[in-house]
Curated annotation (Swiss-Prot):
CDD domains: LysRS_N (cd04322)
Organism from which the protein derives: Saccharomyces cerevisiae (strain ATCC 204508 / S288c) (Baker's yeast)
Name used for this protein in its record: Lysine--tRNA ligase, mitochondrial
Taxonomic lineage of the native organism: Eukaryota, Fungi, Dikarya, Ascomycota, Saccharomycotina
PANTHER family the UniProt entry points to: LYSINE--TRNA LIGASE, MITOCHONDRIAL, LYSYL-TRNA SYNTHETASE
GO MF annotations in UniProt: ATP binding; lysine-tRNA ligase activity; tRNA binding
Length: 576
C-alpha cells in the first residue's frame, strides 16, 4: 500500500502516458506537440483526469506526500527569492545540491529545450510582497532521481503538465547554464501534481463586459493589484484608529429599524419576524455604545441602500464610521487631515515595497496635500452660496426651512432654471432645494480640485443628527469632504440632547409627509428607543463617516465603483 501511494504521489501521471511510452512505435515529441493547447488535447487530458480525480486532486494530508518530502524544507517563492535573489553572493552562481527545498506554486509557463530539459515559471498569486513574483524551475532529465520507470517516462510526464496546474517542486537552489545565470530551483525529482486546470485561460481579457462577467479569469490574466491596494487601505484605516485607542465593534445589520442616514432601506422578513430591514448606517448603534460608556468606537462594515446603481453607487457598500467623545467640529477636521496624511504616506511606502505601479490620482493627491502642509481647503456653506447667488440667505428675517421663503429669496433666473415647478411648493422641500443649490453652486464650482475641500456649517434641515451651531441656529457643526467633485466624508458634532434630537426627527418625518418622497429623507420610522437611551446621558461626541469603496476608487485611479469591488456591483455578481 505504501509503495503504491508513493508512486502515485511521485508521478500523478495518467495511465495512458505509461502505456504509450512503452510502445516502440511512439514517436518523439516535438516542441510544437509539447506546448499544444488545442481543444483536442485538452479534451483528451480532461478525459484522463475525470477517470481518476483522486490522483489529480490529492489531499495535502496524504501520507505519501509527506514521506516523499521529509528531506526537503518547505519554503515559499517569496522566501526563496528573498534569501537568494537579494544576495547572489550566497551561492556564488554555483548550485547547492545539499540544500533541499520544497516549493508549492502554479505553473505560469512551460518551455521545452529538446526532450530532456524543461523550464517552468512558477508563481503563487500575489500577496503584495516584493519578492513574491515568480521562480524558474529547471527540470533536467539527467538530474532527476527516482526509479528507472520514472526516468523513462520523463517526456510523457512533463508534457502532461500545463499552464495553470498547481505543483510541488522538489530540488535545490542553483543557476541556469545560460549567460544570464538566472537563479532557479534545480529539480531532483519530478514535480508533484497538486491540482490540475481543466479550462485553458484566454491569452488576454480586455473587454469590460467579459471582465464584469468573470472576475476570476480577469484576476488571473490582469492581476489582483486593486484587491491588494484595497486590503492595505482597510488595514491602514484600522491601524490609524487602533493606534489611537479606538475600540472596534460590530453592530446589528438586521433589525426592525434601519435609521441613521438619508436612504431607502431593504425590507425583508424572517421565520420569527414579519418586518426586518438591512441597516443603512450603523450610526445610532455606535452612539448607543458611546452612551454605554465607551470613549472611542469604530466599525468597518457593509451597509445597504435600496437605491439606484451608477458609477459611484452600489446597493451594498463598505463604510468606516468612528465616534470620539469631547470632539468639536474643528477637532474632527484635524483628525481627518491626520488620517489622510497617514494613509497616503503609508500607501506610498506600500507601493515602493511591492513595486506596484503608483496610480496617477494617488500621486496627484499626495503632491497637492504635501504642498499644502496636509491641510484641506475650506468652504463655508451659506456665505459661499450667498456670494454665488448674490443674495443673503443668512438674513435674520428669512427662514430657509420654509420652501416658499427660500424660493422667493432666489434670483428669478435661478429659480426658473433649477426649480421650474416652484409654484407647486407643496411638492418641493427646503431639503431638496438646498441640496440642488449645493450641488450646482458649491460642489461643481468649489470642489473640483485634487486638494480635498471641506464644505462646512450645512443648514440644519440637511443635518438632522448634527449639533446646531450655537452662533447660528439655521446651520450645524457639520462638514463634508470633496475631492474632484465627489463626496468622500461626512462628519459632525453629534446631537446629544434627547429633546432636540426628537424635534429634528419629527421635522424630517414632516418633510416626508409633505413631499411624499421617502428616498430623500430618513427612514420614516422614528427611533424613539434611541431618543429614550439618550436620556441616560450622552457626552459631547464627534462622528465621522467614510465611504471605503470611493476612497479605493480615488487611490486606485478607477472611474467606476465596480472596479474596486472584488466581484463588482450587484448586476455583475448576478452574472457570475
Amino acid at each position: 500500500m505504501n509503495v503504491l501511494l508513493k508512486r502515485r504521489s511521485l508521478t500523478f501521471a495518467p495511465r495512458w502516458l505509461w502505456c504509450k511510452c512503452r510502445s516502440s512505435r511512439s514517436r518523439p515529441y516535438s516542441l510544437a506537440h509539447a506546448v499544444d493547447t488545442s481543444k483536442m488535447e485538452a479534451t483528451r487530458r480532461n478525459g484522463q483526469i475525470v477517470k481518476d480525480l483522486g490522483r489529480y486532486y490529492p489531499s495535502m494530508s496524504e501520507s505519501a506526500l509527506h514521506d516523499l518530502c521529509q528531506e526537503y524544507k518547505e519554503v515559499t517563492i517569496a522566501d526563496f527569492n528573498e534569501r537568494f535573489l537579494g544576495n547572489p553572493a550566497t551561492l556564488h552562481h554555483e548550485d547547492n545540491p545539499n540544500l533541499l527545498l520544497s516549493i508549492n506554486g502554479r505553473i505560469k509557463s512551460i518551455r521545452f529545450s529538446g526532450q530532456k530539459i524543461v523550464f517552468i515559471d512558477l508563481y503563487n498569486g500575489s500577496s503584495g510582497l516584493k519578492n513574491d513574483t515568480q521562480l524558474q524551475l529547471i527540470v533536467n532529465y539527467n538530474k532527476i532521481g527516482g526509479s528507472s520507470e520514472d526516468k523513462a517516462n520523463f517526456s510523457e510526464y512533463m508534457n502532461f503538465l500545463k499552464k495553470g496546474d498547481y505543483i510541488k517542486a522538489l530540488g535545490y537552489p542553483g543557476f541556469s547554464q545560460s549567460r544570464v545565470k538566472m537563479l532557479s530551483l534545480i529539480c531532483n525529482k519530478l514535480p508533484i501534481v497538486l491540482s490540475v486546470s481543466q479550462l485553458p485561460l484566454p491569452s488576454r481579457l480586455n473587454d469590460e463586459t467579459k471582465i464584469k462577467s468573470n472576475r476570476v479569469v480577469d484576476y488571473q490574466l490582469n492581476g489582483t493589484q486593486t484587491l491588494l491596494v484595497r486590503a492595505r487601505i482597510i488595514k491602514l484605516l484600522r491601524k490609524f484608529l487602533d493606534d489611537r485607542n479606538f475600540v472596534e465593534v460590530e453592530t446589528p445589520i438586521l433589525s426592525s429599524k434601519s435609521n441613521g442616514a438619508m436612504a431607502k432601506p431593504f425590507i425583508t422578513s424572517s421565520k420569527d419576524f414579519d418586518h426586518l430591514e438591512l441597516r443603512i448606517a450603523p450610526e445610532l448603534w455606535l452612539k448607543r455604545l458611546i452612551i454605554s460608556g465607551l470613549q472611542k468606537v469604530y466599525e468597518i462594515g457593509k451597509v445597504f441602500r435600496n437605491e439606484g446603481i451608477d458609477s459611484t453607487h452600489n446597493a451594498e457598500f463598505s463604510t468606516l464610521e468612528f465616534y470620539e467623545t469631547y470632539m468639536s467640529m474643528d477637532d474632527i477636521v484635524t483628525r481627518t487631515e491626520d488620517l489622510f496624511k497617514f494613509l497616503i504616506t503609508n500607501l506610498q511606502k506600500f507601493f515602493q515595497d511591492t513595486r506596484l505601479p503608483v496610480p496617477k490620482t494617488f500621486s496627484e493627491l499626495h503632491l497637492a496635500l504635501s504642498e499644502n502642509n496636509w491641510k484641506f481647503r475650506k468652504v463655508e456653506f451659506l456665505p459661499t452660496l450667498n456670494k454665488e447667488l448674490g443674495i443673503d440667505l443668512m438674513n435674520s428675517g428669512l427662514d430657509i426651512n420654509k420652501p416658499s421663503e427660500l424660493l422667493k429669496a432666489l434670483p428669478k433666473d435661478i429659480a426658473k432654471k433649477y426649480f421650474p415647478s416652484a409654484d407647486n411648493t407643496g411638492q418641493l422641500s427646503s431639503l431638496q432645494i438646498l441640496n440642488k443649490l449645493s450641488d450646482v453652486f458649491l460642489e461643481q464650482r468649489h470642489c473640483q480640485s485634487t486638494l480635498p475641500t471641506v464644505i462646512y456649517h450645512q443648514p440644519a434641515i440637511l443635518s438632522p443628527l448634527a449639533k446646531t451651531d450655537p452662533q447660528n441656529k439655521q446651520v450645524t457643526k457639520r462638514f463634508e469632504v470633496f475631492i474632484k467633485g465627489k463626496e468622500y466624508i461626512n462628519a459632525y458634532e453629534e446631537e446629544n440632547c434627547p429633546q432636540l434630537q426628537l424635534q429634528k426627527f419629527l421635522q424630517q418625518k414632516q418633510i416626508n409627509e409633505l413631499t411624499g418622497n421617502k428616498t430623500e429623507t430618513l427612514s420614516p420610522v422614528i427611533d424613539y428607543q434611541y431618543v429614550e437611551t439618550m436620556k441616560y446621558g450622552m457626552p459631547p461626541v464627534g462622528g465621522f463617516g467614510l465611504g471605503i469603496d470611493r476612497l479605493c476608487m480615488l487611490f486606485c485611479d478607477k472611474k467606476r465603483i465596480e472596479e474596486v469591488l472584488p466581484f463588482g456591483c450587484v448586476d455583475d455578481v448576478n452574472r457570475q
